[in-house]
């Protein structure tokens, strides 16, 4: 069901639209958690470190696709708010072929550079065998990731956040069942975990594509387009590429830090692999809320509903900050039990390192919550370049401080953990300051 976010209660509209997105991303995290949990319990610390490092790499690679889809989705929302059906159809067509081409290119590059990644990420010898086996399979799922994210972005842009949730729920269940069968039953090792994830990704991608083709008139009407204007492709690419750059820079910084983490050995690698899953799971709802907020702002920006934009911003800040405060308290208190979900209780060194990470990051979730709102705001107001600037500041600070602080013997790996919230807070300060200085021009 499509939801017109330019009408009705501001807070209620955002929350009802955001809840399926949050639930959907919870299920998306189940892909990764299923791999990590089963691998950690049944295949050992080296396999856990391999899958954890692979997850960071895959996040970087798929961020290219995700960024392009998010950028296109923002334009779709603006067209929907403007009631420009023909323009929406042209944007869908132009973005689909552009992102499909980028996906094919990304897949080729990933396979060609597979062995080079070992040097860049400083992967230890005892981990590389499992990591290579996992990556060589998981790369096959990149086209499935494209299909799901493209059509999910389109459906959400017109206010339908429920259908992406349904397809993701089905694929999440399939992923977990296949994980158990391939790893425990068939003894296929880390390759089996990758195979389970790839099958689930194609199931969700093909399923949602078929649904959109059958049920959405905007997608079906693409067949009536006589030609595709190059200026439309240029507009899509100029906007989506900036969003893509923002996502890629963000995850490149994370990938660079992963290489630094790997240099501290298998114990820290395994701790980081488990803790980063918990960390992402904890703040993921505010990330999804930021994306839902972005769609709300974009539709109202297209409809020139300035009052709803400002009301929505105030409401979103209150909701996001309240949630972050609660989650920060829970993660701080339950950090150790959360680590034992992924790591055997006897692995005390791994658990201690993970608890340290979680308590430092978790204390500053309000910082990342604010940053996600800023990303969504500037994307919706057709200022994706500002999102790139904020990302460069956040990740640049994180990477620079991580290397500087961790090189001090008295600080060590703790310096990597502290670099993250410092980067969040600096980016927040700039993003909020820019909006306050330019709000009359941004939302006239």
Walk through the language-model features, giving the residues of each.
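Small-residue-rich hydrophobic transmembrane alpha-helices
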Residues: 48-108, 145-164, 271-335, 368-390
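Short alpha-helical transmembrane segments in multi-pass integral membrane proteins
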Residues: 1-18, 76-141, 185-241, 297-364, ...
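Helix-terminus/linker motif at the lipid-water interface of multi-pass membrane proteins
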Residues: 26, 30-49, 118-125, 181-188, ...
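Generic alpha-helical transmembrane segments of integral inner-membrane proteins
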Residues: 22, 26, 30, 34, ...
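Transmembrane helical elements of multi-pass membrane transporters/channels
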Residues: 16-35, 137, 148, 171, ...
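Transmembrane alpha-helix boundary and packing residues in multipass membrane permease domains
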Residues: 21, 25, 37, 74, ...
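Short runs within selected transmembrane alpha-helices of multi-pass transporters and secretion channels
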Residues: 69, 137-156, 164-172, 193-208, ...
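Small-residue hotspots at the loop-to-helix junctions and early N-terminal turns
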Residues: 45-56, 135, 194, 266-281, ...
């Amino acid at each position: 069901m499509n939801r017109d976010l330019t009408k009705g209660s501001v807070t209620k509209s955002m929350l009802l639209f955001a809840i399926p997105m949050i639930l959907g991303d919870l299920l998306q995290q189940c892909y990764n958690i299923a791999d990590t949990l089963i691998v950690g319990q049944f295949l050992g610390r080296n396999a856990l470190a391999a899958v954890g490092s692979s997850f960071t790499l895959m996040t970087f690679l798929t961020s290219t696709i995700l960024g392009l889809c998010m950028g296109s989705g923002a334009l779709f929302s603006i067209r929907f708010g403007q009631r420009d059906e023909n323009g929406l159809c042209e944007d869908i067509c132009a973005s689909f072929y552009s992102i499909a081409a980028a996906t094919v290119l990304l897949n080729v590059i990933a396979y060609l550079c597979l062995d080079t990644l070992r040097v860049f990420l400083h992967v230890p010898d005892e981990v590389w065998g499992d990591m290579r086996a996992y990556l060589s399979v998981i790369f096959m799922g990149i086209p499935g990731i494209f299909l799901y994210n493209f059509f999910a972005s389109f459906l959400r842009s017109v206010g339908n956040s429920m259908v992406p949730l349904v397809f993701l729920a089905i694929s999440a269940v399939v992923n977990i069942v296949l994980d158990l069968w391939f790893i425990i039953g068939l003894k296929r090792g880390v390759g089996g975990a990758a195979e389970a994830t790839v099958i689930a990704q194609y199931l969700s991608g093909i399923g949602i594509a078929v649904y959109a083709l059958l049920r959405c008139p905007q997608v079906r009407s693409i067949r009536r387009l006589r030609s595709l204007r190059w200026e439309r492709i240029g507009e899509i690419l100029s906007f989506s590429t900036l969003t893509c750059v923002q996502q890629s820079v963000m995850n490149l910084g994370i990938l660079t830090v992963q290489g630094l983490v790997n240099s501290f050995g298998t114990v820290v690698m395994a701790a980081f692999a488990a803790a980063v899953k918990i960390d992402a799971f904890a703040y993921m709802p505010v990330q999804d809320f930021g994306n839902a907020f972005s769609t709300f702002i974009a539709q109202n920006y297209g409809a020139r509903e300035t009052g709803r934009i400002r009301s929505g911003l105030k409401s979103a800040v209150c909701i996001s900050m309240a949630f972050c405060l609660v989650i920060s308290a829970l993660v701080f208190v339950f950090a150790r039990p959360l680590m034992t979900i992924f790591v055997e209780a006897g692995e005390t060194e791994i658990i201690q390192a993970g608890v340290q990470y979680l308590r430092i990051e978790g204390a500053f979730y309000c910082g990342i919550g604010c940053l996600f709102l800023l990303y969504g705001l500037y994307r919706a107001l057709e200022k994706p370049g500002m999102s790139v600037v904020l990302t460069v500041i956040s990740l640049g600070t994180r990477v620079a401080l991580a290397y500087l602080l961790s090189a001090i013997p008295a600080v060590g790996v703790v310096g990597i953990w502290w670099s993250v919230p410092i980067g969040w807070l600096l980016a927040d300060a700039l993003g909020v300051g820019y909006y306050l200085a330019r709000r009359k021009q941004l939302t006239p």
